[in-house]
């Protein structure tokens, strides 16, 4: 038995301008080579573009986009007796949000154009409306889980 105490769960920090954890999660995922200032700059420019496009609060658009892309269920590869099955598993809220952010950023990076802030804002607006690559990815994941429902007892 371990003599060490249990580790305290880290509280997610919030960003300086919007004071929001989701924005901070987004910043930490967009971060490359430790350039956090640049990551913040990209996010805030994207938020400004969302404000101009939709004329609504960019935080509500971000929340709506992430809520729309967050999956409820995903598949996990599980090896059973020589063959690998895709086993559907339920996803917790934090993990779901992390996946949603990852998919939104991947879809943004795939978009044509040079400016990441513009691509991210476009993807967030599309996701909030219920279209876009990230939404397609979520639907694809749900379809995979539905198709492999027979293997749910392998959990």
From Swiss-Prot:
InterPro entries listed in its UniProt record: Ribosomal_uS7, Ribosomal_uS7_bac/org-type, Ribosomal_uS7_CS, Ribosomal_uS7_dom, Ribosomal_uS7_dom_sf
Single GO cellular component term: small ribosomal subunit
GO molecular-function terms, A-Z: rRNA binding; structural constituent of ribosome
Keywords carried by this UniProt record: Plastid, Ribonucleoprotein, Ribosomal protein, RNA-binding, rRNA-binding
Cross-referenced CDD domains: uS7_Chloroplast
Subcellular location: Plastid
Principal location: plastid
Pfam family, one: Ribosomal_S7
UniProt-listed GO biological process terms: translation
Role played: One of the primary rRNA binding proteins, it binds directly to 16S rRNA where it nucleates assembly of the head domain of the 30S subunit.
HAMAP family linked to this entry: Ribosomal_uS7_B
Subunit relationships: Part of the 30S ribosomal subunit.
Family, as annotated: Belongs to the universal ribosomal protein uS7 family.
Protein name per UniProt: Small ribosomal subunit protein uS7c
Gene: rps7
